[in-house]
Amino acid sequence: MKLTCVLIVAVLILTACQVIAADSSCWFCSTGFNKCCESTGDCMTYPSEYNASCPEA
C-alpha cells in the first residue's frame, strides 16, 4: 500500500512538472520552482543558477 501511495505521488509530481513546463511563462523558471523549464526552451534568458537544467542564453 505504501508503494502504491509513493507511485501515485510521483505520477502527480511528474504531471504537475509537465504542466508547468508547458506554460510559456518563465516566472516559474526564474524563481526556481520549475525544474522542467529546459523542455520549453522559453527560459534560456535566465541565468542557469536559477535552474540547473536551463542553459545560459
Curated annotation (Swiss-Prot):
It comes from the Eukaryota. It is found in: Secreted. Residues 1-22 form the signal peptide. The keyword Mitochondrion does not apply. One of its GO terms (molecular function) is toxin activity. The keyword Disulfide bond applies. One of its GO terms (cellular component) is extracellular region. Disulfide bonds join 26-37, 29-43, 36-54. Keywords: Disulfide bond, Knottin, Neurotoxin, Secreted, Signal, Toxin. Expressed by the venom duct. Probable neurotoxin. Belongs to the conotoxin O1 superfamily. This is Conotoxin Cal6.34. It comes from Californiconus californicus (California cone). The lineage of its organism: Eukaryota, Metazoa, Spiralia, Lophotrochozoa, Mollusca.
